[in-house]
UniProtKB/Swiss-Prot annotation:
One of its GO terms (biological process) is spermatid development. This is Junctional adhesion molecule B. Residues 1-28 form the signal peptide. Disulfide bonds join C51-C110, C156-C214. It comes from Mus musculus. Belongs to the immunoglobulin superfamily.
Length: 298
């Protein structure tokens, strides 16, 4: 009975698979499927990176590597490498880190190779280490003095916490959560973003004066910045209007005075006076004296 094209294709694929397996065995190498673990630990505590591979033998060779932008050796030739020498130890094929730091976070890979009847066998296991870090003291931006009716932003930020912290603003020791709904801040109009750490007053009022500080918090811990006082001053609109009116009046008086002086001819008289200056008189007198000098009479 003739076989269908699909059946022939499956036979060809099976044939190539068998050939590939025979090739690996002939070259004395086989690899097992790798595993992946996730380990989460708080900074400065201990963590165990386990190499979960099949049964190991005394002839097995172990290597631990950290994979990042490059590959760095952690355990090689039966010895811990780098700074792991002083703060880690080997327990069988596992690594016990006694004092985890945030720089330890990343992907680790253990490789176990051992001779078998079919050749050299390589087993690989992967461990993803995540280090949780408490927030540091956040950087807070609070203006010292603002005017009523203006839009004002207070900012809070932390760059060290993992996971990323949430931010809560406080005024005079009282938490400002979400939009105000009554209470001591019922005359305020503000919005607090707990993700970005921005507290925004859409139209600040005199009642918003006080001491403000921000707290950054995550699952590991919380820290807050020192309190800073913000003074809200009332904008004196009537005083500004009066000042503008006075300045405009002074400018108008100066302008009218200049026009009046021009009409009365004060500027033209001054010009005529400059034309009849003492210099011309001196010249005339000199000419008359020259005419009557006796030394020139014939």
């Amino acid at each position: 009975m003739a076989r269908s094209p699909q059946g022939l294709l499956m036979l060809l694929l099976l044939h190539y698979l068998i050939v590939a397996l025979d090739y690996h065995k002939a070259n004395g190498f086989s690899a097992s499927k790798d595993h992946r673990q996730e380990v989460t630990v708080i900074e400065f505590q201990e963590a165990i990176l386990a190499c979960k591979t099949p049964k190991k033998t005394t002839s097995s060779r172990l290597e631990w590597k950290k994979v990042g932008q490059g590959v760095s050796l952690v355990y090689y030739q039966q010895a811990l490498q780098g700074d792991f020498k002083d703060r880690a130890e080997m327990i069988d094929f596992n690594i016990r880190i006694k004092n985890v730091t945030r720089s330890d976070a990343g992907e680790y890979r253990c490789e176990v190779s051992a001779p078998t009847e079919q050749g050299q066998n390589l087993q690989e296991d992967k461990v993803m280490l995540e280090v949780l870090v408490a927030p540091a003291v956040p950087a807070c931006e609070v203006p010292t003095s603002v005017m009523t009716g203006s839009v004002v932003e207070l900012r809070c930020q932390d760059k060290e916490g993992n996971p990323a912290p949430e931010y809560i603003w406080f005024k005079d020791g009282t938490s400002l959560l979400g939009n105000p709904k009554g209470g001591t801040h019922n005359n305020s109009s503000y919005t607090m973003n707990t993700k970005s750490g921005i507290l925004q007053f859409n139209m600040i009022s005199k009642m918003d004066s006080g001491e403000y500080y921000c707290e950054a918090r995550n699952s590991v811990g919380h820290r807050r910045c020192p309190g800073k006082r913000m003074q809200v001053d009332v904008l004196n609109i009537s005083g500004i209007i009066a000042t503008v009116v006075v300045v405009a009046f002074v400018i108008s008086v100066c302008g009218l005075g200049t026009c009046y002086a021009q009409r009365k001819g004060y500027f033209s008289k001054e010009t005529s006076f400059q034309k009849g200056s003492p210099a011309s008189k001196v010249t005339t007198m000199s000419e008359n004296d020259f005419k009557h000098t006796k030394s020139f009479i014939i």
